[in-house]
Regions:
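Acidic/histidine-rich catalytic cores and adjacent linkers
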Residues: 156-291
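Inter-helix linker motif
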Residues: 120-138
Length: 291
């Protein structure tokens, strides 16, 4: 039976101000599992700390080879800066975390700059929920329902080519009315469509960072109703405890055996695994075209 969460007290907080279990979490070895996907996000949570009344939580969730989601990091950062994210990623690497195949996040620039520095081969997938919200924010309310429908058609397209065609339909309808909305999609298109190079069974998981967003909602609610954490360290400990409890409810990846395939280097096109026979057929087609 899980022990109910209680606010940290002097008797439960370690010498450096952290909960003992949080300190153990921050120091544990990560070399015993391999992680194919990461979900990363930073959210500012309001707490009562006098002048410094914002806690920026930097959270990393990994997907293990068996498809299980695991909380890897909960740290405080300075406005999701590159330095803050680099520190988190370097620490994970030092404790044995492998380079992920794909990292999903909401698009904060500091996150991606740190990823390029620490794990340069990892690919990036932008969150479609954030992308859709950003486009709709550019449009007048009368255009938003139609635009939202078309944006979901893009996100749910069965192939990358179909998604591109759906984008052009949206462009034809909206670009003259608000070119900034389409420009947002054009800018991030490569990262919005990276999921097509991974198993179709995983697309639902890889299109949004909802696993973090829903967990953060619990943290935000708790920090709003409490009288105040009193310190950044105590608030961080509370966030860790709530997220640690939340991971018991996180859904395992569909067709989880495909996670291991991705780690082993299997390649996918539009969600379907590419075999050596497919490569041979493509090469023969290219030769015929050249002839």
């Amino acid at each position: 039976m899980q022990t109910p969460w209680r606010s940290p007290t002097r008797s439960t907080v370690a010498v450096n101000g952290r909960l003992p279990e949080h300190e153990a979490f921050r120091r544990r070895e990560l070399r015993f599992h391999r992680y194919a996907y990461w979900f990363v996000n930073g959210v500012h949570v309001s707490i009562r700390l006098g002048k410094d009344d914002k806690l920026c939580l930097l959270v990393v969730i990994g997907v293990r080879e068996d498809g299980t989601k695991e909380l890897l990091a909960v740290e405080d950062g300075y406005r999701e800066s590159t330095d803050s994210w680099s520190a988190v990623m370097r620490d994970l690497k030092a404790r044995g975390a492998n380079e992920p195949v794909l990292v999903l996040g909401d698009g904060a620039l500091g996150t991606w700059a740190a990823l390029r520095d620490v794990f340069p081969a990892a690919r990036r997938q932008a969150c479609w929920v954030h992308a859709i919200a950003n486009v709709l924010d550019c449009l007048p309310k009368r255009l938003q329902p139609r635009a939202q429908t078309m944006l979901h058609e893009i996100m749910e397209a069965p192939t990358r080519a179909d998604a591109a065609l759906a984008l052009e339909r949206l462009r034809d309808e909206l670009e003259a009315k608000d070119p900034k909305a389409i420009a947002k999609l054009d800018r991030d298109w490569k990262h919005l469509t990276a999921f097509y190079d991974f198993p179709a069974e995983h697309w639902r998981h890889l299109q949004t960072s909802n696993v973090i967003e829903s967990s953060f909602a619990t943290v935000k609610l708790r920090t709003r109703v409490t009288k105040g954490a009193g310190s950044k360290t105590a608030a961080l400990a509370m966030a860790y405890k709530l997220l640690d409890a939340a991971q018991e409810r996180w859904r395992r990846f569909n067709d989880h055996h495909l996670v291991a395939d991705g780690l082993a280097g299997a390649r996918f096109k539009d969600g379907i695994r590419v075999t050596d026979d497919d490569n041979d057929d493509n090469e023969m087609t290219d030769e015929k075209v050249a002839a």
